Amino acid sequence: GLGDILGLLGL
């Protein structure tokens, strides 16, 4: 999802 990668980056 949208927060999949962003979540890993901590964004």
Swiss-Prot record:
Annotated organism of origin: Litoria rubella (Desert tree frog)
Protein name (database record): Rubellidin-4.1
Positions of modified residues (Leucine amide): L11
Any single Gene Ontology cellular-component annotation: extracellular region
Tissue distribution of the protein: Expressed by the skin dorsal glands.
Top-level division of the source organism's lineage: Eukaryota
Free-text function comment from the UniProt entry: Shows neither neuropeptide activity nor antibiotic activity.
One GO BP annotation of this record: defense response
Keywords associated with the record: Amidation, Amphibian defense peptide, Secreted
Lineage: Eukaryota, Metazoa, Chordata, Craniata, Vertebrata
